[in-house]
Amino acid sequence: MEKQLIGWIFDIQRFSVHDGQGIRTNVFFKGCPLRCDWCSNPESQLLRPQPLYDEKKCIGCGHCAQTCTQNAITTQPTYTIDVARCMHCETHSCASVCYAKALTIAGRPYTVDEVLRIVKKDAMFYGTSNGGLTVTGGEAVVQTEFLVELLKRCKEAGIHTSIETCSACSWDKIRQTLPYIDEYLCDVKHTDPVKLRAETGGDAQMLLDNIRKLAENGAKILARVPMIPGFNTDEAEVESIGRFIASCKIPRVEILNFHRLGVPK
């Protein structure tokens, strides 16, 4: 029997309307090469399950610490999770005994069939709204083999496909998605290599080159610019971003407002 591909996913949101046209199902992939301080989904960064703790929901029962097989959780003097130890855990029993749902585990394995089954549930809404699937994360291209197979299956089913991407992967990986992506939602965070690396750990030249190559290959692109105070909001950088987008002949730009939704995570 052929071995099934496994992808690490931390959320699947149906009836989404903000990441691509129409009504969409957003599939959130684990794993990202960048470490943006303002990331709205920090639980996406590691390519394996990781704990999420919500202090507001915690009732202080201590069951999680008592159950933890890695001795990774301490509740006194403050609630602390040793993530390095937690990464060795295979059971994540701590979350299963948390009745208040203050402790959850972000990420679990899915097969392509499992994801596709969920995506297809809203097929009738895709047809009436020009919607479909949006893969996001994290950076979905990190899991290239699983991603391409999922996209291929969606195209075979007549489902429109979009990807929200930071472009922080090799061109060899990104180009494999070209036959199966209808629209790329590309982040353009900064054009200065020193500043981008300092704030995200990313290689600006690689990111910008990948976007340019997508444009040169005829990809449909929406450039998305997250406005981060003190990072890319000065006049010189805004103009530089604008010149880059114009040089790629990308006709559409979306400005994303700054937020701190990732802070509680």
Question: Across the structure, where does each feature detected by a protein language model lie?
Answer:
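Iron-sulfur (Fe-S) cluster-binding modules
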Residues: 1-5, 248
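N-terminal pre-triad scaffold of radical SAM enzymes
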Residues: 9-63, 79-88
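Short, solvent-exposed beta-strand edge segments and adjacent coil->beta transition regions
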Residues: 22-24, 78, 100, 130-132, ...
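Short loop/turn motifs at secondary-structure junctions
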Residues: 35, 69, 94, 99, ...
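Iron-sulfur cluster-binding cysteine motifs and their immediate structural context
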Residues: 37-44, 63-81, 91-108
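FAD-binding FR-type
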Residues: 85, 108-114
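Conserved AdoMet/S-adenosylmethionine-binding subsite of the radical SAM
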Residues: 113-261
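Short helix/strand-capping connector loops at secondary-structure junctions
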Residues: 264-265
